[in-house]
Amino acid sequence: MKKNVSYLTAKTLALCFSAQAQLNPAQPLSSAPPYSLFEQWAQPVAPFQMFPHVYYVGTRNLSSVLLSTPEGLILIDAALDASAPTIRAHIEALGFNIKDLRYIINSHARLDQAGGIARMKAWSGAKVVASAANAKQLALGGKQDFALGDALSFPPVKADIIVGEGDSVTLGGLRLTALMTPGHLPGATSWLTTLHQGGRSYRLVYADSLATPDYYLINNKNYPSLVADIRGSFLSLAQQQADIFIANKGTRFDLENKMLRLQAGDLDAFVDRQGLQQYVQQSQQTFEAQLKQQQNKM
């Protein structure tokens, strides 16, 4: 039976925020993308309703999704620290009150998904929800990243609720369930929920990154299970049936074209029953080619 998570025990807190393991000095790190790339991704777009009770409040390529319920709001991801004022303004432009935000859900703890969480939490008083590994990285502000070291830090923030596989957060009749999809980061988490509209049920999948950009895949001393983890995540996400597929980067779920279709009057523009499988297949092909290339160099 899936556990409904409503609080974080003192014991769990102690386990999650104990002393952090240092990175292995013998393991080379990957080159971090330039911050200018994130700034390009953070260009503004107007907020809009994607589907009843589901709103896009993020940037051009950094997803931030707001879910509304009779008991308050849930936010998934918060882009860059510099994006936080924009996300807040988007929420308020849609007619919502930032103080009604109850939960901030994290997919993975890097600056482009988690950078704005600290400010969003401070403004709203919402509880931050993350996997144990993500919670450690959130507390470190992204430092000691297994692939990037301290290159892309962000304002640290404490997680209030720790989730594992199959755990869920419930608010106002809406249940969000965690699907562990490690590989991009050890704590990477996708999120599942079911929406009800017009007498029908729609399965929404918010998929985390499946990318391994410039990672050292073979015998990575900072993340020995990387290859097994990402392959397991391909399998886990491929087994999901999504009516509405959202990813934490807009390009991964064709955000721009779907926005245009919505603006043209297609109210089902974000209903996409093939998108998740295509995303997984493309990601897996890219990964296997990257792995083969590294194996050939050995």
Where do the PLM segments sit?
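Bacterial N-terminal signal peptides
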Residues: 9-18
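Divalent metal-coordination and catalytic microenvironments
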Residues: 53, 67, 77, 108, ...
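Boundary at the C-terminal end of the N-terminal hydrophobic targeting segment
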Residues: 19-23
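C-terminal regulatory/interaction regions
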Residues: 273-298
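Conserved beta-strand hairpin/beta-sheet module of binuclear metal-dependent hydrolase folds
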Residues: 40-94, 98, 190-212
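Active-site HxH/HxHxD metal-binding segment of metal-dependent hydrolases
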Residues: 54, 82-85, 92-168, 271
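Metallo-beta-lactamase
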Residues: 24-34, 43-44, 49-51, 73, 80-82, 100, 158, 168-171, ...
